[in-house]
Amino acid sequence: IENFELIKPNSKFDWLNQRNSDFNSLIKLGNKRNNDALFIEYTGGIKTGRDAWTTNFSKNTVIKSMENSIKYYQDNLGNLEVYNLSTNEISWTRSLKQRFERFQSLSFKTDRLYIGMYRPFTKKYFYYDPDWTDQQYKMSIVFPTQLSENILLSLSNKTEGKELTCLAIDLLPDVNLFAGGSQNLPEFLYDNLGKYSSIRESILNNFNSLTADSVLPYIYGIFHSKEYKMKYFADVSKEFPRIPNLKNKEKFINVGRKLMDLHLNYEEVPIYDDVEIQLSVQPSYKVTKMKFVKKRDENGKLVNDRST
């Protein structure tokens, strides 16, 4: 048979999209099983199990929705028939049912109102109370309070044939920050004594001239490198990302630091001088579905040009 390529599986039994042979020699970023990774801990974003009640662009809407849910919960405490009732007041998850069946009384807590990153560059108000959060993973030691300060590198969890995505955030992340989920590498962790670095010093010592406060910019610069994305495309789609110990670290640190500043402070970027904002007296927010026209014009699409 002509024009056929003989394929042999590699040591990891990959037939197609074979992983790079040197990936295992790179530094692990996270490992739940032992202490051989650069970060002491990494975590998924919070999974509320009831986004329609706990998240919104309006703070008052979140407060009202959660007060109604908690009132409904309290009013029906002890009545297991409530599960069979149709209601818009509450969403029953397994964890909430367990509390309900233990007759656990719950109340609204104003100090659990957070601003979080719901989707990339999309902030919302969150009601982040462990009692009303289906899965919080390790977020309780990353953002234990509203006032907790932290920077996270949020990674796309399942690339599934797409490039690795990495976004620097300084807010509580949703579990589905990216499609397929996200994993987050925090700069700090918190305990009863306060915050401490999440960088494991024993692993950091393997890097020449890399300090703890340069770790995140260094990683950020690497993960936004086209060379890294192309070389380890198959690896990061199947395994947790790793990083190389490069000689020219300062170059990646500088680029990573600039990108982090841009992505963290995107709302403070000055508007272009030539941009004019025109306000309509009677604005229309009706969106017309985009579609291809039968006879293509120079754009090829019919779009709503009243809003962006």
What are these language model-derived features?
Residues 1-308:
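Sequence-level detector for compositionally biased, low-complexity segments
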